[in-house]
Amino acid sequence: MELTSRERGRGQPLPWELRLGLLLSVLAATLAQAPAPDVPGCSRGSCYPATGDLLVGRADRLTASSTCGLNGPQPYCIVSHLQDEKKCFLCDSRRPFSARDNPHSHRIQNVVTSFAPQRRAAWWQSENGIPAVTIQLDLEAEFHFTHLIMTFKTFRPAAMLVERSADFGRTWHVYRYFSYDCGADFPGVPLAPPRHWDDVVCESRYSEIEPSTEGEVIYRVLDPAIPIPDPYSSRIQNLLKITNLRVNLTRLHTLGDNLLDPRREIREKYYYALYELVVRGNCFCYGHASECAPAPGAPAHAEGMVHGACICKHNTRGLNCEQCQDFYRDLPWRPAEDGHSHACRKCECHGHTHSCHFDMAVYLASGNVSGGVCDGCQHNTAGRHCELCRPFFYRDPTKDLRDPAVCRSCDCDPMGSQDGGRCDSHDDPALGLVSGQCRCKEHVVGTRCQQCRDGFFGLSISDRLGCRRCQCNARGTVPGSTPCDPNSGSCYCKRLVTGRGCDRCLPGHWGLSHDLLGCRPCDCDVGGALDPQCDEGTGQCHCRQHMVGRRCEQVQPGYFRPFLDHLIWEAEDTRGQVLDVVERLVTPGETPSWTGSGFVRLQEGQTLEFLVASVPKAMDYDLLLRLEPQVPEQWAELELIVQRPGPVPAHSLCGHLVPKDDRIQGTLQPHARYLIFPNPVCLEPGISYKLHLKLVRTGGSAQPETPYSGPGLLIDSLVLLPRVLVLEMFSGGDAAALERQATFERYQCHEEGLVPSKTSPSEACAPLLISLSTLIYNGALPCQCNPQGSLSSECNPHGGQCLCKPGVVGRRCDLCAPGYYGFGPTGCQACQCSHEGALSSLCEKTSGQCLCRTGAFGLRCDRCQRGQWGFPSCRPCVCNGHADECNTHTGACLGCRDHTGGEHCERCIAGFHGDPRLPYGGQCRPCPCPEGPGSQRHFATSCHQDEYSQQIVCHCRAGYTGLRCEACAPGHFGDPSRPGGRCQLCECSGNIDPMDPDACDPHTGQCLRCLHHTEGPHCAHCKPGFHGQAARQSCHRCTCNLLGTNPQQCPSPDQCHCDPSSGQCPCLPNVQGPSCDRCAPNFWNLTSGHGCQPCACHPSRARGPTCNEFTGQCHCRAGFGGRTCSECQELHWGDPGLQCHACDCDSRGIDTPQCHRFTGHCSCRPGVSGVRCDQCARGFSGIFPACHPCHACFGDWDRVVQDLAARTQRLEQRAQELQQTGVLGAFESSFWHMQEKLGIVQGIVGARNTSAASTAQLVEATEELRREIGEATEHLTQLEADLTDVQDENFNANHALSGLERDRLALNLTLRQLDQHLDLLKHSNFLGAYDSIRHAHSQSAEAERRANTSALAVPSPVSNSASARHRTEALMDAQKEDFNSKHMANQRALGKLSAHTHTLSLTDINELVCGAPGDAPCATSPCGGAGCRDEDGQPRCGGLSCNGAAATADLALGRARHTQAELQRALAEGGSILSRVAETRRQASEAQQRAQAALDKANASRGQVEQANQELQELIQSVKDFLNQEGADPDSIEMVATRVLELSIPASAEQIQHLAGAIAERVRSLADVDAILARTVGDVRRAEQLLQDARRARSWAEDEKQKAETVQAALEEAQRAQGIAQGAIRGAVADTRDTEQTLYQVQERMAGAERALSSAGERARQLDALLEALKLKRAGNSLAASTAEETAGSAQGRAQEAEQLLRGPLGDQYQTVKALAERKAQGVLAAQARAEQLRDEARDLLQAAQDKLQRLQELEGTYEENERALESKAAQLDGLEARMRSVLQAINLQVQIYNTCQ
C-alpha cells in the first residue's frame, strides 16, 4: 500500500525506487558538465544513462488546459483544514510564482520538483468546477519513462487516465485508468490488478476521496510484482519509450452539494490542485549510450536535468542512437541487450570505396552474417564487398585484392566471344572459371575466340552462336574433319551426290545414304515405269496406271497383267452357218484343255467369222488357232482372211500392207492342238476387224489324197499373240535391251501364250512378262470380277482369273459351267437332272429345266403330275372326295376339306362330329356346345352322339359345366352366355374350397369364404392379428410382448397387431425383437412400459456403451462408479476428471457408507450432522455419538432465530440496493419535492414584476426548503449510524448464515438422495413390477414343470417332433438325386436349343425368294433382298439372271393356282387347330394353377410342422439357459421346474404319434405327383425338339409358298413380277421375325423350366409349348407335302418330255442320267419318310399330352381329398401351436422377471 507524503514526513523512509532515482539524478547532474569516457559496461553489452526527473529543466514544455487566474484573480475555497478561520482565497496566475512578489500564482510550472525550503507554498491549480483538464509534457527527444508520482493539494481526481505518445503527439496510447467507479467512468476497461505487464486496466485505490490533501497517485510502467520474460524485447522498449506524456483529469470529487446548489460559490471549492509532479525516466538510447548531452535547443546547464541527446557508443549515431554510423552498416541496427552490445560493424570493401549501405535481403541470404553493400566501387571493381572485377575485366591472381591494379582488361575477340568480349573475372575450379579466360561462342574456338569450329563457317559478331553450321548432308559428304569450306560453306560431295549441301542425288539415282557413292540407281522397270527417273527420297519410279512398287514391277490389287494370249475369241461366240456347239463337262480335279464352254464342230467348206473389236497397241500380231482333232493323225488346211473396215492410211503403222497380206494360209499337222499361221497380221487400236476362218479340207491320215469321211474339226478359240521382240525393251540396242532379249529367247518365255493351261512362269521370265504386258496395255487391266459370280473383287495378278463361286466359269466368273444354271449372287446351281426322268445331265442355263422323258414332270424331271403319287410308278390319290392331291411320296392327302382330317380325310376334326367316309348323310357337323367351333361361345373340347338317345354329348372344358357347357363350374366366374364371355378361375390365392359353389362370387370372381385366417377380395392378406404369406396358407397369430409393444396396437391383452408380412410387432421406443421382448443395444428398463431408456454410459469411463438390461448399471472401468460410470467409484467422491477422494465418514453417524459423490458430505442418520457425520445435529444435544433431542422449547427459539435470519436477509438486500443507487437513492422522493420548490423559487425570482405576496411566498418557500434540507441532513446522519449498525449485524448474520448454509447443503444432499431413490422407484414401477414378478414367478414355476414333463416323458412331444423331422429329412435326401438328374437333363436340352438358334440364318430364305443370299449390300447385289429398294424407293427383289421365285415363273403357273386354294384350306384348318391349342393352353394353365395351389398348401403344412418344432426347441433352450444362469438360486430353479412340469400338451402321445404318421402318409402321396410330373420332363424336351423341326419345315414351306405366289403373278403380267416377289419377301421377313420371337419364347420357357424344377405346377405349363409344337408341325407338314407333290407333278411332266427326247441323239447318255435321277429320288424319298415320321411323332405326342392331362385331373381329385385331410390335421396343429406359444410366452416372461429380481 502506497504511503502518503504526510506519512513519510512522520519518519517513514522513502521507497527504494525514489531513493535510487534521486541518487541517479544527483549523479547525472554532477557528471553532465564534462564528457565521460566510455563506460566499461558498454563494451560488454547494453548501457543506460542515469534516471532522473524529466520535468527538471523542461518547465516550459509542461502545459495544462486549465489554470486558475490566468486572465485575472479568481476566488476559490478549501474544504480541508477546517480548523483555520479563512477558507476562501484568490488565485492570480498572470505572473509566475514568487514567494515574495506573487505567492498566489498557481501555474503548471509550480509542480516541477524543487528543493526550496517551503516547497508546499507553490502548486498548480485548475479553474473552479471544470472536470475535464489535461496536463501534457512535450519532450524534445525519445526518453525512457519509468514511473509517475503526483501529489495533490485537494482531493485526488475521481477519474483520470495517463497517456503516452512515442511519435511526438501524432498517436496516443493509454497507460492506465484511475477511477473511483471504473464501471461508470470507463465501461469495458478491465479492472486492476493487471495480469500481464502490458495490460491496460482501471485502478481504484488512488481515486478515493480521502485524504483530502497531499494524496498521491503513483504509476509504474513495469509493475515489479509481474515477472518480465525478456526486459530487452521490442515490446518492453516500446512500452517505456515516450516523446509526450499526457494526464487527463476527467471527474472531480464532490460532496454532492453542487447537485443541489448551482451557485458559483458552491463550485469554488471543487477544482484540481497539484503540489508536485514527478516524471521519472532517462535518456532513451536503445542501450548504446551511458550518458546524454543537451539536445539542440535545450538548456545546457540546467541543474539536475535529464538531457535528451545520447552520446552514442557501439558505432551508432543519431539523437537516440537509432542509426549505425556511416561505413558501419554491415549488420542491421539493433538495440543493445544485456551481455550483447549489438554494435554496428564496419563494411568490408577492400579499400576500393568508403561508402556502404545495409541491405536486409543480402543479410538474410548470407544466413544473418553480413548485410553491408559497398557503394561506388573504384579501380574497376564491383560486388557487395568490391571483391569482384567489373565486366570486361578480370582479377590478376598475382596481385592482392586490395591492390588498385588488381583488375585487368580482357583480351577477347568480340566477334567470337560471348557478351562482346567478356572473360572470366576470377578463378573458380568448382565452376570451371579461369581468370582472364575468354568464353567463346558455341561454334567458336581459339584462345581469343578468333576462329570457327570444324563443321562451321562464317565468323560474325551478329551471330549469337558465332559461326553457322555447315549445311552438309552427312550421307552425301566425303568423310573427313572439315565437311565444308570455313569461309564460303561449300560442302565436299560424294561421286553420285550434288548440291551445295551435298543433299541431292544425281539424276537417275536415289536414296542418299552413307554408302561410298552416296546414292543408288533408280532401276525402274522398263515396262511398268513411264521413264527411268525416280523420287530422290523414296526411289519411287513413275508408274504406269495401276502399277505399284518402288520399281513399278507389281500390279495394284484389283488389277492384273494380261497373259500373252489375253486377246482370245471363243469359237462358240462366232458367226456363221448353224453352229454345231459341243459343250464339255469339266471333270472335278482336272484342268481343262480348252477355254469357254466347249468347241464348235467345223466341217470342210464351213467358215467361222470372228469379230475383233479392238486391240491394245498398233503392231503385228501372230494368229494362234486352238483346236482338237477328232481322229488320230488328223490334219487340216485352213485359210484366214482379214476383213478391214476400209483402206489402210499410208501414214499409219500398218500403211505398208498390201491386200494379199490379209489372206493367210495355214496347215495343221497331225497330233497338233494349235496352229500358228505363218504370217502375222498388222492391227491398230480403235478399229473393228472381221476374221474369217475357213476349213479348206481335212483328213485322217498322212496321205492327203486319201478321201476323208470322218467328223469335222473341233475349233476352240482364236488368239492374237503380239510380236513382242519388236518392242523397244528388246530392240533398244543398249546392253540392257540385248540382255533382256537373250533371256526371253533362252528361257522361251513366249510359250506362255500357246496353251490354255497355265503354269507359274520361271523367275527369269516373270519380270519380263510383266514388263511386256504393261508396255502393250499401258499398265495393268482391271479385274472386273462379276460380283455375283466371284468370291472376291480381286483376281490373280497374273492373267486376271477371278476366284469363282461353285459352278461358275470365265475369267470374270460371269458364266455358268456346263451342268449348272441360274447365274446369280450365289453362283450357279447344279442341274441335278433325274437320271430316271431326264434325257441329259445338262439343263437350260437360265431356268435349270432339264429335258424330261415322257411321263416325267418337274424342273428336274423327278416327280409325278398333280393328283398322283409314287414316282416313278405314279398312282391316283385316295382322299374320300375331300382333297384333290396328296403327298407325292406317301400318298397322304393334302388340304382335307369339309372339316375332315386324317391321312385319307377319313375322320372329323375336333369340334365336329359325323362320318366323312359315307358318300352322303353323315358328313362332319359342328358340336353345339352351346355354339359351334369358330364362334365365341364354344366351350367343349369335343362331342359325340349317344348311340341310344341320339343326343349330342358335349365334353366341356375345365371351368364349364351344363349340358351344353353353358355355365361356369364351382370355383370359376364369368358370363359365358354373352358373346365373348368366358369362365375364369377365381383368384383366391388357394385359400378357398374349390368345390364350394359359394366360395367366390360367380359373376365378379370376388372371394367370399376365405380360409386359413385370410381376408380380402382375393384372400391375399392375413387377418389383423395374424402374419405370414397368405398365398402359401401360412398366416400365424402375432406374438407380442406386452411390456415392449405399443399398447395402441393391442385391442386386447391376448391379441396385438403386427406387420402382416414379417410378423414384426409395433415396438415402443428403443425396443427391438420380432416380439418387442428386448431393449435395443445400449438401452435398458423394458419393464417401465414406456419403452427403454438410454444407458448413457460415460464414453471413456465405462468399458462400453452397454448396460444391464434391468438395472441400467454400466460396466465401469477401475476408479469410476455410479450408474453411468460418470462419478467416482463406490465409497469415493469428487470430480473423476480431476481427482477422487475416499469418503471420510464417521461410521458411527452415517446412514449409508456412500458419501455425496460431488461434495463428499456424508449421509448422516437422524440427529447427526457435520460433513463427516461426527457431531450432533441442530436440535440435538449430548456428546457424539450419543445425541439426544433437545427440549421441546427448542422449537420455539429456533423459529425466532429463523425469523431473525429472514430479517437479516431483507436488510442485506436493502444494503445491496443502497450500494447500487447510492445514498441519494433513499431520498429520491424528497429531492424531487425540493426540486419542485426550487423551481417555484426560480420562477418568482426570475419574474420582472414581483409583488409583496410573491415575495412573501418566496420567503416561505425558502424557509420550507431550508427546513426540509435540515431534516434531510438529520435523516442522512441517522441513516449513516443505522448503516453502521446494520453492517455489524450483517457480519454477525453472515456468520450465522454460514452455519445455515452448511445445514442447507446437508439437507439438499439428503433431498437429492431421496429424489434419486424416488426416481428409481418411479422408473421401476415398483408396485406393478412387484405384482408382475410375483405373478411371473408362479407362472415360471408352472412352465418349468410342464416343460420338464414334455421333455422328459417317453415318448414326449419333443421326441415325436424330432422323429418327424428326421423322417422329413430322409424323404428330402431320397428325392435329391432325382431332382439333380432332372436339373442336368434340362440343362443339356437348353444347351442344344441354344446351339440350334445360332445356326439359324435368313440367308437361305432370301436366296430362295430373291435369288441372292442377302448378305451383300443392296447396292452391289443385282437381285436385291430383304429391305432393299430401287432408285424410286420401291422394294427390289429378283431380276434377270436371278435364281429366285421370279426366274421360275414359266414353270409353276398351275402349281401356284392350286397352292393358293390349298393354302386357304390350310389356313382354315390352322384356325381350328389354333382354337383347340388355345383351349388346351387354358386348360393347362388352370391345371398348373391347381397344382401350384396344392403344392403351396403342402409346403405350408410342412412349414407349420417345422415351425412348431423350432419353437419347441427354442422353448427348451430358453429353460436350459435360465437354469444355467449364475444368478439363478436353487429356489428359483425349483419354482421354474415346477411350473414347466405343470404344463400339459392338449394331446396324448399316442394322438401326436398317429397325427405325425398321417401327415407323413399324405406327404408320400404328394410325392407321387412330383414323380408323375417329373416323368413328363422327357416329353417336354421331346416336344421342344419337335417344335424346332416343325419350325424348320414351316420355314421351308413358307419359302415355297412365296415362290409359288410370285410365279403366278409373273406369268399373268411381267410388269408385276417384281412387286409380287417383294410382297413375298415381306411375308418371309414377317415369318422370320415370328420364328425368332418363337425361339426367344422357347428360350425363356426353358429358363423358366430350369428355375421351377422343384414345382410340379411349372412342369404343367410346358404342355402349352407341346401343343404349340403340334400346331406348327401340322402346318409345316401340310405345306411341305404340298410342295413335294408339286415337285413330283413337275417332274412327271418333264419326264414325258424327256422320254420324247430320249429317242433322239441322247440315247447313249440315258443310263448315266437314269443313275443320277435314282440318286435324286432317294433323297426325295428320304425327305418324305422324314415328314411322315414327324407327323407320327406329333400325333403320338398329342395323345400322350391328352393322357397326361387326364391323369392330372385324376390326381387333382386325389389331391383335394388329401388337402381336406391336411386341413383337419393343420387345425389340430394350430391348436398345439397356440398352446406352445402361450407356454413360451409365459416362460419368457418368468425369465425376464427373475432376471429383474436378480
From Swiss-Prot:
Bias (Low complexity): 1350-1363
Keywords associated with the record: Basement membrane, Cell adhesion, Coiled coil, Disease variant, Disulfide bond, Extracellular matrix, Glycoprotein, Laminin EGF-like domain, Phosphoprotein, Repeat, Secreted, Signal
UniProt domain Laminin N-terminal: residue ranges: 43-282
Pfam families membership: EGF_laminin, EGF_LMN_ATRN, LAMB1, LAMININ_IV_B, Laminin_N
Residue numbers carrying Phosphoserine: S1532
Region (Domain II) location: 1190-1409
Its biological purpose: Binding to cells via a high affinity receptor, laminin is thought to mediate the attachment, migration and organization of cells into tissues during embryonic development by interacting with other extracellular matrix components.
Subunit structure comment from the entry: Laminin is a complex glycoprotein, consisting of three different polypeptide chains (alpha, beta, gamma), which are bound to each other by disulfide bonds into a cross-shaped molecule comprising one long and three short arms with globules at each end. Beta-2 is a subunit of laminin-3 (laminin-121 or S-laminin), laminin-4 (laminin-221 or S-merosin), laminin-7 (laminin-321 or KS-laminin), laminin-9 (laminin-421), laminin-11 (laminin-521), laminin-14 (laminin-423) and laminin-15 (laminin-523).
Name listed for the protein in its UniProt record: Laminin subunit beta-2
Organism: Homo sapiens
Organism classification: Eukaryota, Metazoa, Chordata, Craniata, Vertebrata
